[in-house]
Amino acid sequence: MSKLRVRFAPSPTGYLHIGGARTALFNFLLARKEQGTFVLRIEDTDVARSTQESVDAILQAMDWLGMSCDEGPIYQSDRFDLYRAKIDQLVEQGKAYRCYCTAEELEKKREAAMQDGRKPKYDGTCRQLQEVCDDKPYVIRFKAPQEGATTFHDRIKGDITFQNEELDDLIIQRTDGTPTYNFVVVVDDAEMGINLVLRGDDHINNTPRQIMLYKALGYPVPDFAHVPMILGADKSRLSKRHGATSVMAYKEMGYLPEALVNYLVRLGWSHGDQEIFTQDELTQLFSLDNIGKSASVFNPEKLIWLNSHYIKTGNPGRLAQLLAGHLAADGIDVANIADLEPIVVALQDRSKTLVDMAQQARCFFADDIQFDEKAAAKFLIEDNRFVFEALSAALESCDDWKEDILDGVFKGVLEATGLKFGKLAQPARVALVGGTTGPSICLIMQILGREKTLARLQGAMSRLGQ
């Protein structure tokens, strides 16, 4: 049995979207599991729409998700001579022909077919034409078999059959001389030795046409596996109106790559009831056998749940590095990344995304606290002056600024004043971070440090009654 060779072949006309990322992951994981080869091909034959910016964005997104190719990127735009040679081969063998029908003529044929209740398809006007008119624009069409059927075994969906009479003569070269998608993809997959084409099921209708081309060109036909689509919550095809569809948009929103990878692979594939997988587990367990045959629904809440898990269980040092980037985007430069680690530890259980964590971490760096208006109105009142004075006095005499020591000081203030915990902790929390939620009050004080803690308590007292 030959070694597995799979490919991911995006078009560089935009960013890598969720559906494309999942297709790439399925190919990547299968190649890694079977010690095969993962090829990256950039399908940039549409020169007008293809951009280097899009290529860079696709490569960046794949790198962020941890996907490295074994071969490539290979650019179709570098292979036009090969495509032209293969088209010439088909024409010389009588398997393709020039079609001089104009767009207006083709539209009339389409309308006539619709009026007669027939499926619109090219009627073969130029199929047997012997004359060659070099001064007239033309396309080149593949001479498709008109009888019989084309059947292939889809490794996800099973046997699929198309009646050849339903398929028309496919255009393989446009009037400007450029080859079309269905032609170049066959040539490339064959020339690159791709023996499994794993892609979205929106390509199923292309498959019989491509199989015909493989056979006409004398190439072996690869295996095919078509992955069901990803739908939005309303069961329509996933689009921007369902939320972000660009992979890198999720990075900007504070998602971890391992969370997105875990979620996307589980979107259509399963291994029992297991929800959370390490990269090694995905590589070991992934197979086509457990890919479902029906479409999957994108669930943002499930992705957030997974992201929360990976933040909660993540390495604080790594998360600190990532958090620094989000803080920098918010105008907060962290001189020493190590200073962020205790903040990360304090916020890991409370953060759904890194953006969420960055918003909560702002209070530890800001010179001016942004007070929650309701919290300030409730707790920064004259009746609580003695609370701040008692806590400030006790903290002034504390030299060992560690959480456990501060906890002892805090309990001492509770005992001395007779206050219940909330009556002391909530006013103090509002004074220190601007609101009533956050980590433990003593951990907040440890992270802020002695000078900043005392300054904020003093600042809160100056606001009392305002």
Swiss-Prot record:
Motif 'HIGH' region location, chain numbering: 10-20
Keyword Protein biosynthesis set for record: yes
Key words of the record: Aminoacyl-tRNA synthetase, ATP-binding, Cytoplasm, Ligase, Nucleotide-binding, Protein biosynthesis
Protein's cellular compartments: Cytoplasm
Reaction equations catalysed: tRNA(Glu) + L-glutamate + ATP = L-glutamyl-tRNA(Glu) + AMP + diphosphate
PROSITE patterns on file: AA_TRNA_LIGASE_I
Xref: InterPro entries: aa-tRNA-synth_I_cd-bd, aa-tRNA-synth_I_codon-bd_sub2, aa-tRNA-synth_I_CS, aa_tRNA-synth_I_cd-bd_sf, Glu-tRNA-ligase_bac/mito, Glu/Gln-tRNA-synth, Glu/Gln-tRNA-synth_Ib_cat-dom, GluQ/Sye
Ranges spanned by the short sequence motif 'KMSKS' region, renumbered to the chain: 237-241
UniProt-recorded Gene Ontology molecular function terms: ATP binding; glutamate-tRNA ligase activity; tRNA binding; zinc ion binding
Protein residues bound to ATP: K240
GO BP field: glutamyl-tRNA aminoacylation
Keyword Transport: no
Coiled coil regions, renumbered to chain: none
Gene Ontology CC: one annotated term: cytosol
Superkingdom classification of source: Bacteria
E.C. no: 6.1.1.17
Assembly notes: Monomer.
Function as written in the Swiss-Prot or TrEMBL entry: Catalyzes the attachment of glutamate to tRNA(Glu) in a two-step reaction: glutamate is first activated by ATP to form Glu-AMP and then transferred to the acceptor end of tRNA(Glu).
Family stated for the protein in its record: Belongs to the class-I aminoacyl-tRNA synthetase family. Glutamate--tRNA ligase type 1 subfamily.
Name of the protein in its database record: Glutamate--tRNA ligase
Originating species: Syntrophotalea carbinolica (strain DSM 2380 / NBRC 103641 / GraBd1)
Gene that encodes the chain: gltX
